[in-house]
Design a protein with these regions (language model features):
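Conserved active-site "lid/cap" helical segment
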Residues: 1-84, 92, 96, 155, ...
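Condensing-enzyme catalytic core mediating Claisen C-C bond formation in acyl metabolism
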Residues: 1-24, 172, 204-267, 271, ...
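Conserved catalytic cysteine-centered active-site region
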Residues: 2-4, 54-151, 190-216, 248-250, ...
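Short acidic, glycine/serine/threonine-rich loops at helix termini
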Residues: 22-23, 116-122, 182-186, 253-256, ...
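Beta-strand segments within the central parallel beta-sheet cores of soluble alpha/beta enzyme folds
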Residues: 45-54, 75-77, 105-110, 168-175, ...
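Short glycine/threonine-rich loop-to-helix capping motif typified by GTGT followed
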Residues: 58-67, 252-258, 294-317, 380-386
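Active-site-proximal alpha-helical scaffold in enzymes
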Residues: 81-111, 149-183, 224-230, 341-361
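Extended C-terminal subregions enriched in glycine
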Residues: 262-297, 306-309, 338-342
Length: 387
């Protein structure tokens, strides 16, 4: 183990309910999640001296501190690139703790992404902004690639052409996630599993991406408490050690996908994976369950390949016959993922990784020692190994 490995721990997790209309402000959602996480850890707001969130979060660290009764902050930070920031919020909290910059740091994300601003809509104005983002979007928007689903669809179609994958292969991810969500009382799709026939009959969003290949749009908030292993062991719950944490941006990186690369893949996730294995001293064979960012099912297959669980083009075979379901060789997204539980930019997946290691998941995998968690795909991204 090297670098950050073993020098910080997750001591608490918290969340609001997940819904399509929260009826509360985004600041209230953030405050509820933070206070819930502190209660889970057995800490009070006065113990917190650091806050981390996303650049896309509308709730400034100072506002959350005021709303929750947190006092002075020694560390505060925001990470960019949307869902790619999820694991990086925990990484930055861990770095602050390991370096002595803060003792208790809370990472949070909260939004009304369904009842207010919806990320999946066409936003043509992005391609005309007078900044580098406008230049990037101007490459893709004129060709109709103006939503996340459309961008993923182009790569999914090429992946099918290159490796013989089918829509049903993508559907296997959705079926697994919904199966897990069906037994999770906190999931939006609790009690609502689907079949592969349901997936194949769902309407097309951007060929070949179907409705049931797409994550939900959700209102809610999640928070994660990070502190030192020494302090964590004296708190309420079993400390979950951060065995590795990494960020990655590939060569010629764009948003959602980098169309001008020579090879089909997600090299930014491959870079994250290599760092995680190096820091932790582990291999894919050491992982009992994984939480893979599943905003769209095709990218779940590409992640399995980039992280070394299987070779290029082999993910369709790797996931066959229930391999990623509870009881399979690598259960993924045992909370239901963003397809089944809620889309909270990946933060709810980190919380599920903690539950698996505590032994408190509603879909508990036996004898869990190490959990891999990834953040948003197609963008500069991040990942964790928890143990």
């Amino acid at each position: 183990m090297t670098g950050l490995s073993g020098r910080s721990a997750i001591a608490g997790i918290g969340a609001t309910d997940f819904s399509k209309k929260s009826g509360r402000s985004e600041l209230r959602l953030a405050a509820e999640a933070v206070l819930d996480a502190l209660d889970d850890a057995g800490l009070s707001p006065s113990d917190v001296d650091g806050l981390v969130t996303f650049t896309m979060d509308s709730n400034l660290e100072t506002a959350v501190a005021r709303a929750t009764g947190i006092g002075e902050l020694k560390f505060f930070s925001q990470i960019g690139y949307g869902g790619g920031a999820a694991a990086a919020t925990v990484q930055q909290a861990a770095l602050a703790v390991a370096a002595g910059g803060a003792e208790v740091v809370v990472a949070y994300r909260a939004f009304n992404e369904r009842s207010e601003f919806r990320f999946g809509q066409v936003m043509t104005g992005l391609s005309s902004t007078a900044d580098s983002r406008g230049v990037e979007y101007s490459w893709s928007y004129p060709h109709g690639l103006s939503t996340p689903a459309a961008s993923v669809a182009m790569i999914a179609r090429r992946y099918m052409h290159e490796y013989g994958a089918t829509s049903a292969d993508f559907g296997a991810v959705s079926v697994a996630d919904r199966k897990h969500a069906a037994t999770n009382p906190k999931a939006f799709f609790y009690g609502k599993p689907i079949t592969i026939e349901d997936h194949q009959n769902s309407r097309m969003i951007a060929d070949p991406v179907r409705l049931l290949d797409c994550c939900q749009e959700s209102d809610g908030g999640v928070a994660i408490v990070v502190t030192t292993p020494e302090r964590a062991k004296d708190l309420k719950n079993r400390p979950v050690i951060i065995e590795a944490a990494a960020q990655g941006s590939g060569e010629d990186q764009f948003t959602m996908y980098s169309y001008y690369r020579d090879e089909l893949g997600l090299p930014e996730m491959g870079l994250v994976g290599r760092q995680l294995w190096d820091q932790s001293g582990l291999t894919p064979n050491d992982i009992q369950t994984a939480i893979l960012y599943d905003h769209f099912t095709p990218y779940t297959l590409l992640q399995l390949e980039e992280l070394g669980f299987c070779g290029k083009g082999e993910a369709k075979d790797f996931i066959a016959n229930g391999a990623i379901e509870l009881g399979g060789k690598l259960p993924i997204n045992t909370h239901g993922g963003q397809l089944g539980e809620a889309y909270i930019h990946g933060m709810n997946g980190i919380a599920e990784g903690v539950r698996q290691l505590r032994g408190t998941s509603v879909n508990q995998v036996p004898n869990v020692e190490h959990v891999l968690v990834t953040a948003g795909t197609g963008v500069p991204t991040s990942g964790l190994i928890l143990g």
